[in-house]
């Protein structure tokens, strides 16, 4: 088993770039881990059709840093830190990317089934909107307001209970 843990595998990004990494790093992804189980030791490159090279390299960087972390149990009640928006310092620095890359990382983490990375990405977005008004959130994410003033008033009245007071 030790030989399999240190073996290398090749991933092929959506733009056709092959990236060779340690199997242990790749297995942070449940999708890749299951694919490897299904393929056996065929040595074939594993296609990652939904993730381009730059995003895949960023995801691999995160997986390398976290390769020794215990696997996610999938039980959120057991792991209470999932309920906060606290993010480790390394992960905060890792997520200091432009919005497009941040959202691509979140999509890749979801597709590759890397729950811990998905959590970090979602917490990063949550921290970006925490304590902001709808107008500030629209500005942060460059979202155009398509409500009429009447619709906006109605929404405010219906959601008055949720306002900070």
From Swiss-Prot:
Name assigned to this protein: E3 ubiquitin ligase complex SCF subunit sconC
GO BP term (any one): protein ubiquitination
One Pfam family cited in the UniProt record for this chain: Skp1_POZ
Subunit structure: Component of the SCF (SKP1-CUL1-F-box protein) E3 ubiquitin ligase complexes.
InterPro entries the record matches: SKP1 (IPR016897), SKP1-like (IPR001232), SKP1-like_dim_sf (IPR036296), SKP1/BTB/POZ_sf (IPR011333), Skp1_comp_dimer (IPR016072), Skp1_comp_POZ (IPR016073)
Family: Belongs to the SKP1 family.
Protein task: Essential component of the SCF (SKP1-CUL1-F-box protein) E3 ubiquitin ligase complexes, which mediate the ubiquitination and subsequent proteasomal degradation of target proteins. Controls sulfur metabolite repression, probably by mediating the inactivation or degradation of the metR transcription factor.
Pathway info: Protein modification; protein ubiquitination
CDD domains: BTB_POZ_SKP1
Alphabetized SUPFAM superfamilies for the sequence: POZ domain, Skp1 dimerisation domain-like
Species assigned in the record: Arthroderma otae (Microsporum canis)
Keywords: Ubl conjugation pathway
Inducers of expression: By fluconazole, an azole-derivative widely used for the treatment of fungal infections of the skin and its appendages.
Region of interest (Interaction with the F-box domain of F-box proteins), residue spans: 106-165
